Structures are given as structure tokens and as C-alpha cells.
UniProtKB/Swiss-Prot annotation:
Does not seem to be glycosylated. Inhibits chymotrypsin activity. Keywords: Protease inhibitor, Secreted, Serine protease inhibitor, Signal. This is Antichymotrypsin-1. The lineage of its organism: Eukaryota, Metazoa, Ecdysozoa, Arthropoda, Hexapoda. Its main location: secreted. GO terms for cellular component: extracellular space.
Length: 400
């Protein structure tokens, strides 16, 4: 396998329905996160040189919804648009409750946490502090005038929250000594397949990088009855792999054409993918699944990506209600993420940061069906809302 488009999705809704023993939830919020996530993924794909990207748009959206409560008028309008519309209080309340719901999951397989570091020279505005509490944010003071020490403190938190998988997402040069407040979000997931792959059956197999290039990759094999669908409109086939953890699953989206990934992504960015995922149904026969094992690590420059999806004012417009007695503006927005898929399951996580400085110091049974994943494809880990997503040119990723 060489190019991979990875979507890691978490589905947690309120209006549930059942199909063949599976519980699904479809909500307006889930659809909003789905569509916004695919737009961010599309821009990430277009900007990536090597096409190895894993990301968590949900992590970005949670921080934006928190920031919105103290932002300027134009920033609020842009943020509301990608968060699904509505008034600012409604948006913060909705995403705050979502964050609370995630915080109640068993941390053995899902951690969602927000940390706010406030400069010793500043205090959070009262209203913003109340919103931070709604998001169950931890708030600590920190001395940003010592950038290396500040970065070390933040990195220790990231390392702890991701169980050692993301150790140093914040470098010293990302910390402006004039920083007033920095907000960070961690999403970490560790799932085990309901039916594990047999490691003894993993072997080197061909993966089509493109129509002219074939490489060898360690490929796992599973013969199992699975949910499956063929989508002519999308130009892809889809298959579901459930986890032992209740409600979670991974969905593989395999383009019909070897070079079909960009076209599938283009269509997915227009309409989202959750509707297609909810249309999955039992294949009616065993699926002979072959899929590479892999590990991807990547970083996103959100200063570049967010304006392409309609959020640019946070980097320009002063936010009057984040801290007391001053206005701030976002100087840096970034994310570091990873995913690992092997015979036992999948581990994935993302660390997202928004750093704001004072405006005065602004900076930026029948026969089995063969489902052979041997060319660029898409996958979703899901329970109704996109948790992490990405794409990769597996030729240069870690395959083990």
C-alpha cells in the first residue's frame, strides 16, 4: 500500500437506531463535524508533499468553539459557520457538552482533554473562564517568558495524555515570550479488533502506488463476515471492521480505480461520508480482507489550512474577551497526530494547539468476497462524529 487516506471517526449521538445488531446515531452535529472534517482533510491533502497526513479536525473544532466565546465579531461569524451555525452560546454549549461526553469514556481506549495555560501576567476573562469550565478544561498559570521551560511543561502534559505516543509537540520556537494564553486539546484512541488478524498470515504483498508503480508492503489478512457496500456515486467500496470497544469501528473506503483517491476525496469533501457509512450492511458472505499494516506521524500548519476552510479572522481580529484588561489574537495554530494499525487493533491520537498573544505583539457463505486493499484508500475509525482523519503516501510511512 502506498497512498492512504485515513479518517478516524467517533460516532456519539442521541437519536439511535439499530440495524442487524449494530447501534448507529445520526445527528446534525455529527453531520457538521463530518463535512467540516472532510474539507480540512481535502486542504491537508492538497498541501501535503508526501501525502502522509493524519489529523483530528474535531480537536480543532473543539478549540475553535472554546475560543469563539471570547472572540471578535467577525471571528465568531467564521467559526460559527464551520461549527454548524447558530448563536455563539448555542455553539459553545453544544461542543462543550460533546467534550463532556467524550471525557466520560473509559480512558483505557478514549481520552479527550483540554488544557489552558495562562501567562503569569494575565487572568482569564470571567465569561471565558465559565466556558472553559463547561469544556472541563484544566487551567494553569505558566511563565511564557521562559519558552523552553514552558514547552517542557506542555509536552509533559501531552506525553501523559497520549500514553507516551506524542512526546514533544511543542518546540521552544513555537512559544512567543509575550504569549498571553495557550489552549491545547488531546484526543487519544486505542482500540482492539473484535476479531484480530492472525499475525502468522501477514506477508509481503504488492501495493499499487499508481498505475505504473508497484511496491511490497506487509499485508494482513482476515476472512470474516463483515458489513460492506459498493458506492458507484463515490466511486469506491466500503467495509467495516468493528472493535471490541462498544460502538467503535473502522471503515475502509477503497477507490474503484488505482488512482481514484483524489476524486473520492473531492466528492467526500462536498457531501461528507457518514451517510455512506450508515448505509453499510452485511455482505451476505465472508469477506477476504487484505490490508497493509502501517504507522503514520504528521503535523499540520493550521495557520495555512484554516483560512482555506473559511477561518482567517482569528489570526487578525483582536479577541476582546479571552483575558482581562487586554485583547489577544491567535499567533499560531498547529496539530501533531499519529495512527498505528496492526493485527491487534489501532492506536491514534492528536495534539492541537492555539497560541494567542496580545495584539501589541502580534505574530502567525457463498464464495468469499475478496476485498484487496492494494492501492490508495480511505479508512474511518468510528462510533457518529469524526475524531481523526488523514491521508498518506505509504511509500514513505513506517510499515512494520
Amino acid at each position: 500500500m502506498d497512498k492512504l487516506l485515513l479518517l478516524v471517526t467517533l460516532v456519539c449521538g442521541t437519536q439511535a437506531f439499530y440495524m442487524f445488531g449494530h447501534e448507529f446515531s445520526r445527528t446534525r452535529l455529527g453531520d457538521t463535524i463530518d463535512k467540516t472534517s472532510l474539507k480540512i482533510l481535502k486542504e491537508s491533502y492538497n498541501l501535503a508533499d508526501d501525502k502522509n497526513v493524519i489529523a483530528s479536525p474535531l480537536g480543532v473544532m473543539l478549540l475553535l468553539s472554546l475560543y469563539e466565546s471570547g472572540a471578535g465579531a467577525q471571528s465568531k461569524e467564521e467559526i460559527r459557520e464551520i461549527l454548524g451555525g447558530g448563536e455563539a452560546q448555542e455553539s459553545s454549549h453544544t461542543y462543550g457538552l460533546l467534550n463532556q461526553r467524550y471525557a466520560e469514556f473509559d480512558p483505557k481506549f478514549l481520552t479527550v482533554a483540554i488544557k489552558i495555560y495562562v501567562s503569569d501576567q494575565y487572568k482569564l476573562a470571567d465569561a471565558f473562564s465559565r466556558t472553559a469550565n463547561l469544556f472541563r478544561s484544566e487551567v494553569d498559570n505558566i511563565n511564557f517568558s521562559a519558552p523552553k521551560n514552558a514547552a517542557d511543561i506542555i509536552n509533559r502534559w501531552a506525553d501523559e495524555q497520549t500514553q507516551g505516543h506524542i512526546k514533544t509537540p511543542v518546540s521552544e520556537d513555537k512559544i512567543d515570550p509575550a504569549t498571553a494564553v495557550a489552549m491545547f486539546n488531546v484526543i487519544f484512541f486505542q482500540g482492539h479488533w473484535h476479531v484480530p488478524f492472525n499475525a502468522s498470515e501477514t506477508e509481503e504483498k504488492d501495493f499499487h502506488v499508481d498505475e505504473k508503480t508497484i511496491i511490497k508492503k506487509p499485508t494482513m489478512r482476515l476472512l470474516q463476515s463483515l458489513f460492506y457496500t459498493e458506492n458507484e456515486e463515490l466511486g469506491a467500496k466500503m467495509i467495516e471492521l468493528p472493535y471490541k470497544e462498544p460502538g467503535f469501528r473502522m471503515v475502509v473506503v477503497l477507490p474503484d480505480k488505482i488512482d481514484g483517491l483524489p476524486a473520492v476525496l473531492e466528492k467526500a469533501a462536498e457531501k461528507g461520508l457518514l451517510e455512506d457509512v450508515f448505509n453499510l450492511s452485511p455482505a451476505g458472505r465472508d469477506i477476504e480482507l487484505e490490508i497493509p499494516k502501517f504507522e503514520i506521524r504528521s503535523g499540520l500548519d493550521l495557520n495555512t489550512i484554516l483560512p482555506k476552510v473559511g477561518v482567517s479572522k482569528i489570526f487578525q481580529e483582536p479577541a476582546p474577551a479571552i483575558v482581562k484588561n487586554d485583547q489577544v489574537v491567535v499567533s499560531r495554530a498547529f496539530q501533531e497526530a499519529f495512527v498505528k494499525v496492526d493485527e491487534e487493533g489501532a492506536t491514534a491520537g492528536a495534539f492541537t494547539g492555539l497560541i494567542a498573544v496580545p495584539t501589541s505583539s502580534l505574530s502567525r457463505p457463498p464464495p468469499s468476497l475478496l476485498f484487496k486493499v492494494d492501492h490508495p484508500f480511505l479508512i474511518l475509525h468510528e462510533e457518529d462524529k469524526i475524531l481523526l482523519l488523514g491521508h498518506t503516501h505509504i511509500k514513505n510511512c513506517i510499515c512494520f
